[in-house]
Amino acid sequence: MKITIRQVRGGSGVDVWADNTCRGIRRSGHECNLDLCSGVYQFVPMPAYFKKKIPRSDIIHSNSWNAFAFKNETPLVVTEHHVVHDPAYDPYRTVPQKAFHRWIYRCEKKSFEVADAVTCDCEYTRKKLEEVFGYFNAHLVYVGIDESLFRPFTPEKVTVDIPGAKTVLFFGGNLSRRKGADLLPMIMKKLGDDFLLLVTSGQKQGLVLGSSNIVNLGRLMSDQLVEIYNRCDIFLTPSRLEGFGLSVAEAMSCGKPVVATNCSSLPELVVDGKGGFLCRIDDVNDFAEKIRHLAADENLRWEMGVFNRKRVKEKFTIQKMTNGYLDVYNQLIR
């Protein structure tokens, strides 16, 4: 089977998803061509189709924002990563974002109309697809991560010097309001100088966090990222909307407990009380309380980390994701 994954470069976890999906398909003995178009086509996707002809394939797979632009006689699989039109997220969107998302809504609607199959990264997104777009036939395929790369180990390299007496938190991803980055300084102020938060800027610079106990590591390479996951004590994500939570799954795979928001897809990853704690959305005090509870109990952190590693290997690997997509592909070419 020949698969082409074609989409506009997103500068986010969507690009990681595309790369992991392509690698998984190849490992399963099929051909896969990965074609990421320039981000400029995000605003006008159609010219991306003519820029470079799609190789002859059995399946074309793309994300919902761009997929309609690549439709031809080949079966088209469309993946919805997260529904930005979710009413629960509306209070956090800026006026420019709302205008841009109106355009994206039209693009997504076209993609679903021409799709031969639609997949979602989590059950929450599948429900929102039904509510917002009236699309009721989506397949659930959880995103997979490389559990052999993201694994527990004792780092030998030192990307950043960390004082031994501090409890180290880690936030990975773009520093956006959707990810709850604006809450990080407030949470760290509550926690005080006994805690240190390491953040990455992801592939987009995002918000500037001015706080003495927050260190921005910038964009990290994969080996550095795995090191930081393993050097932290707790992974923190006060996100307001996730279609899956790639960095959460990576931290879990490295055997770390997670403190996350009880919203969108996050309860599908983090089992409250077993793999970490889920907090009320935007509740800085709740986040600080849960973090302090974990910081004071090393055995609990270890137990939750072991639970999370096992959970990832059972549910969120590249191979399991690949098997899900291959099932969808095979239904279309029988």
Regions found by a protein language model. Give the residues of each.
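Conserved donor-binding/catalytic core segment of Leloir-type glycosyltransferases
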Residues: 161-179, 185-189
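Conserved acidic donor-binding segment of nucleotide-sugar-dependent glycosyltransferases
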Residues: 219, 272-273, 277-284, 293-298
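Short hydrophobic beta-strand element within catalytic cores of glycosyltransferases
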Residues: 257-260
